[in-house]
Amino acid sequence: MTTPQEDGFLRLKIASKEKIARDIWSFELTDPQGAPLPPFEAGANLTVAVPNGSRRTYSLCNDSQERNRYVIAVKRDSNGRGGSISFIDDTSEGDAVEVSLPRNEFPLDKRAKSFILVAGGIGITPMLSMARQLRAEGLRSFRLYYLTRDPEGTAFFDELTSDEWRSDVKIHHDHGDPTKAFDFWSVFEKSKPAQHVYCCGPQALMDTVRDMTGHWPSGTVHFESFGATNTNARENTPFTVRLSRSGTSFEIPANRSILEVLRDANVRVPSSCESGTCGSCKTALCSGEADHRDMVLRDDEKGTQIMVCVSRAKSAELVLDL
């Protein structure tokens, strides 16, 4: 099996690179010698070191039973920080790329008996892996709702409109017209016993799903975002962070994140998106009350974990397990 380097990253090869929709490319990553890759489960993501020096996190979208490859889809984001553009424009088939081990902050709940999967745009990637896994298992039913602007911008369109998937997938195009948005009320009006909802997409879609599932049992509706939220909408105040292992304290000013301050002090914390959406910087919280601004943590994790790239403090001090 492929083994990580000293920095914990795998050195893989871009076995194939293909444009699969408007502004969206798929990348198939394999071991250069053909060795099996470390396993993953549906919902997992990995971090890629892209040519411009930044690191970006992408969800795996292939079948989790496959051990010979990782498949990701990358959307070219002209309004981003350049990571996706560099990955798409500055790589070719056959190039080497450094990739983290897969990690999963968005797993399918083993207690669920059926699933509603909701994807918006490039948010299809973890949902497709989930759908593949559920189809392979053949034990639990699912229905995938996939919302995009038009067919040309729909990743995996040909596959998901094939006879194989037709009975399990509903694709809806709004053509950029808000009045043609999909009406989810009939989907979420009533929940079935042990039915869970998984949603990945733009903030507006997640807000809609959250609003329509407010009456569902706690812990049955799960979200993963691929875009930053407006964390600046709240007023920032300074606070102190203390590291439990060294006892060192840092003042976090109103205009800087915990991650930025720790990075300047050469305190190693994994990171990628820096928008509270990927889960890379999740850090154990020993004491203090956090002001959670991420889109990753479940309610039952918020007392003991914090995403240091965006979240701040409600108390005067936070103690982190670093």
Curated annotation (Swiss-Prot):
Keyword Transmembrane: no
Disulfide bonds: none
CDD domains according to UniProt: fer2, PDR_like
Residue ranges of domain FAD-binding FR-type in the record: 7-109
Catalytic activity, EC: 1.-.-.-
Any one GO MF annotation of this record: 2 iron, 2 sulfur cluster binding
Annotated residues for binding of FMN: 56-57, 73-75, 81-84, 125, 226, 275
Stretches assigned to the 2Fe-2S ferredoxin-type domain: 239-322
Functional note: Component of the electron transfer chain involved in pyridine nucleotide-dependent dihydroxylation of phthalate. Utilizes FMN to mediate electron transfer from the two-electron donor, NADH, to the one-electron acceptor, (2Fe-2S).
Family: Belongs to the PDR/VanB family.
Protein name per UniProt: Phthalate dioxygenase reductase
Organism: Burkholderia cepacia
